[in-house]
């Protein structure tokens, strides 16, 4: 099967959808939202691992090449994906064909977009009401030059909020699916029931449930201590008719990989100063959405016709992050989970209304 035949193509199935979003996502094969009922369960780390694992595997449409993956961080008030991927100092570029995402490597197999790239400082807060958040999400979908992707992973905020409603409204015709993340704690399990109810009410298919922080393996004796109990996620999945995708233990090595990634992306001072000015313009433009194809947008960069040459080719920091992740004890564990998600996403694409994949009432 060719990449073009497996990708979502503009057609009558997208009637009513925003034309700009249809144009940008027409070559994206699978869209997967990562959800959690509460904060602090490791949802963003699961999103990052899923993106890294998928980009390290073969494309489902062409086994002779590696998968092309995008990760979109719509946790607007708490963006953490840039830091986890070692891209904390990177910035988004403006081209005559829209925003250029940040790539983690020279081969451009993993594209990243987050509001964290647009902030003046990593310590800046995002104090926006619903309409401005919705406009930002719409721009991420409609103005970013995603290109051809096998998977687009969307890291969402915890709980259910304006961001979740907006993203589903914009993506409804693209038949997205979700992966839910919980911990064995009773409070996390209870909060996930609310997220599950949200999925049912919005007819969002759930591919399965991951139990994160499932035990702590001592790096000295390899004994596993179930800090927050055991089996809660699997029991919840069984009770609610979900697929249980697996358990991820607490791995100090993974914590170091994702938390200790440098915030410096070796950006030259003059480019950084220029990008600060550009980012300010981008954030101000959210009230009146930026039109990347306009002359005014192109004029924001000197030589906008040569913007392609400014496309980030991947920093040594991020390549190091990818390699360190592959060397972590968690990588083979999560690879098994990734294999399941990949197979389920393919089945969902072929049979989007399959009762096996949708949560049963």
Swiss-Prot record:
Organism this protein belongs to: Mycosarcoma maydis
Cofactor: [4Fe-4S] cluster
Family designation: Belongs to the Mrp/NBP35 ATP-binding proteins family. NUBP2/CFD1 subfamily.
Signal peptide: none
Record protein name field: Cytosolic Fe-S cluster assembly factor CFD1
GO molecular function list: 4 iron, 4 sulfur cluster binding; ATP binding; ATP hydrolysis activity; ATP-dependent FeS chaperone activity; iron-sulfur cluster binding; metal ion binding
Pfam families membership: ParA
Domain of life: Eukaryota
